[in-house]
Amino acid sequence: MIDQVKGTRNLYGKDIDNYLHIKDKFLNCYASYGYKFVELPNIEHKDLFTKSIGENSEIVTKQMYEFEDKAGRSLVLRPEGTASVVRYHNEFHKDQSNKYSYFGKMYRYENPQKNRYREFHQAGAELIGTLDNYSDVQLIKSSFRFLNSLELNFKLKINTIGSVDERKEYVSVLKKYFDKNKKDLSKESVEKIESNTLRILDSNVQEDLQIIDLAPLITNYLEDETIQKY
């Protein structure tokens, strides 16, 4: 007998009912706000993610399912949905502003644990081509409405990571800070100082927490225009 692949799951009975219920709620909610659903391919070019996520990111270096097809092209099973939506927009609707929703399977080679799989579903909404505050508020409101419709106990936190230039300056400051304190960081975080600095802030490793708590704040590196918009 051949077993299912490690890190995957079968949806049947109550599980598939819950899945279809969540998907239906999601699609109806975002459609009511003008988001158009796009069905994306599970297979993408590897370069799409090395360029968007970063070739040194943990997803690219450790988690992507990648292979070479018979034509010699480097392909991957998509690890997340945002890059695929942006690829679709730039390929077919580049000069327009559009609102997209997506719901589909993603793949990451991680250690399977409770409620965490190597093949999993991700839902998302992307707003491309507009900078006005109203659109941001609408996206936040639609997300709140969707989660609320599932009767979940959740807390909505709103953040800003600034502009590209502001973020670049902040990452530079963070690198210097973490490099100065690397003797007190976990091995995993030390490895991310150069390649994926911001991800250190997500660490739950006990020895990292105090260093992270004292790290510089991005709010100190935002321009007045960004702060006012936020």
Regions found by a protein language model. Name each.
Residues 1-230:
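TRNA-recognition modules of translation machinery and tRNA-sensing kinases, especially anticodon-binding
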